[in-house]
Amino acid sequence: MSQVTDMRSNSQGLSLTDSVYERLLSERIIFLGSEVNDEIANRLCAQILLLAAEDASKDISLYINSPGGSISAGMAIYDTMVLAPCDIATYAMGMAASMGEFLLAAGTKGKRYALPHARILMPQPLGGVTGSAADIAIQAEQFAVIKKEMFRLNAEFPGQPIERIEADSDRDRWFTAAEALEYGFVDHIITRAHVNGEAQ
């Protein structure tokens, strides 16, 4: 029995919820079902790395129902997704807002999905800064760098001109699943799933 299998089979002390997530992990399914923070990012990054090490030829499915959260934590997840040699299919369910939208769109092109009633939010960039004048200047400079990179990537994911992303991000913008498909954040709207796990 492999070390990975051993790690998964030791379910003593797990709650019912933990056991469900462990079972899903064995099917290469992981969940982002909360606000994005460092703890959640560390867990998701570890799961992606584990599954990629187990089999680099099989897809990982990332289901997203998240209001967003920390940019740095989200970028850690994104960088790990890029680092992984396997394709990562992303699925919007419920709400994929802010960093949730970013990670949804960052999935492997052709394998980004939305459930019919999912809602996707492309947010207005926020950059509140506090502290001394010197601290504010440093924070403002860093925010400008991050904002520019987020615009670049959020334009690259759907294949939109960066000018359109900048204009559309001037205010929070919500998308239905159909609108997200038209915009390019997702490639398919799921109507049902086959027994073998393939979405349709």
Q: Model-derived features: where do they sit?
A:
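Terminal-region recognition feature
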Residues: M1-Q200
